[in-house]
Amino acid sequence: MGGLAERKGIANMNINVKKLKENAILPTYGSSGAAGADLYACLDAPVTIEPGKTAFIPTGLSMEIPEGTAGLIYARSGLACKRDLAPANKVGVIDSDYRGEFIVALHNHGAQSQTVEHGERVAQLVITPVYTPAFIEVEALTDTQRAAGGFGSTGK
């Protein structure tokens, strides 16, 4: 579907990407409406992830996430459902001032070993706006009907 710079959309932007390894693959979108850009494994040799274990999978890329946004690294649904592989921290957060390599901590939630190959799509990157409000200490909060009810308090 093409690289980040080829997209058309409401919030069209470009992201500077630096290849840290010659064989790294730039992120791509799987369809014209995809929210997440696929991130690819950049490996010198296949990596086997044993059941219940986590492996750090490099992408061979670093990026300039625009100020006022963050990059969120999510699981790819097919990889999670078919092979039980998903980011260990569920959602990785890439801050706009981070300039290091994008690495996916991929966890094997299944009962069988899984092998990741170079060029395999291992996660997806979603760019989203970020708000950084000031936190103000107060003596009391405004009352609401829900109040402090949580964990199922609004219904079954």
PLM regions: where:
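DUTPase catalytic domain/fold
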Residues: 2-156
